[in-house]
């Protein structure tokens, strides 16, 4: 019996070692890098497997009780790496545990490993990006976060870079910001979380290869700060937060746009520059922006509109009149309305039934529908009574009694056109 148990134990011990090396490496890559390194003591076969890991992750706080050992351990791991390509390196550096000089050296060593993706998070001081980064030929993805200052030379050349994320990163000056983007000739995806106290007031994004652009700004950003966007290949645009101005030029390929803006827009062309899109999400006060006269959203088939102010319903009228091919309409009301029920003014319904209602609208959804508000009821009934192709209308309201629900359904059903066989849902 004992021999059987011992034999069974030997079999169990050998099971992992009998797996293909590629699978073992894949398993090790799911572990924290420091844990994966310690597996080298398990057997001779495992002694070198960790050196083939495609991804390495290090956090200096994990070694905060071993002062000055972090940079040595990371350096040793990078110099021991044997795979032809290091697919990803994620460094979380606290400068009181690993100073700027050592951090710069680690980045330089990583580039010698044919690094494809670098994620660098810095805290505890201001870190200046080393010049070696600005001429890395293998880097495909770069994510820089927090206490980082970029002094970008005009000689920058990141020819392989396709994805760039900048989280609260600051630039030495306007020229550095321009140099960074001009030195990325194949950049396709850019995400910017703007540093609130940046020295760059006008952020110019002129990249001919750029396809996706996402911008986040906080309420503490200078209200005079803004953006100039000139990217002819852009297909997706999202802007969130407070901006002083936004000039969008030459974006003929734009397909989807999301504008969640909480401050006044100085320029007048914001919506006019979005007329080529097929999908559009709008969240801002209509009183803060001028609707482009005569502009038609010929390609628009999907529209989401946040109705957080009474005036938003009049923006809806303008959008319906200007979107002849609209197929899907979603209205989103905040959970708790900040404006009074008896608001001054009323909804200005279209003078002529919009073309999209007559020929194209198939799906209508309203989240946060206030069925007791006269203006919202008027909007809902107008859309239901004037659509010929509507297949489904869904209304999400706050919790109401069974009697109120029956009353609301009856009220809406009374105007649904029989010829469009619309499915009316109340949730």
Swiss-Prot record:
Task: Tell me which InterPro entries the record gives.
Answer: F-box-like_dom_sf, F-box_AtFBL13-like, F-box_dom, FBD, FBL13/AtMIF1-like, LRR_dom_sf, LRR_PRU1-like
The F-box domain sits at 13-61
> Could you name the domain of life of the organism this protein comes from?
Eukaryota
- One short Pfam name that applies is F-box
Known CDD domains for this protein?
F-box_AtFBL13-like (cd22160)
Q: Where is the FBD domain?
A: 346-396
Gene3D superfamilies, per this entry?
Ribonuclease Inhibitor (3.80.10.10)
Q: Which positions does the entry assign to LRR repeats?
A: 67-93, 98-122, 141-168, 169-194, 213-241, 258-284
What SMART domains does the record point to?
Answer: FBD
Q: Which UniProt keywords apply?
A: Leucine-rich repeat, Repeat
Presence of keyword Signal: no
Tell me which PANTHER family the record gives.
EMB|CAB62440.1-RELATED, F-BOX/RNI SUPERFAMILY PROTEIN-RELATED
* Full protein name: Putative F-box/FBD/LRR-repeat protein At4g13965
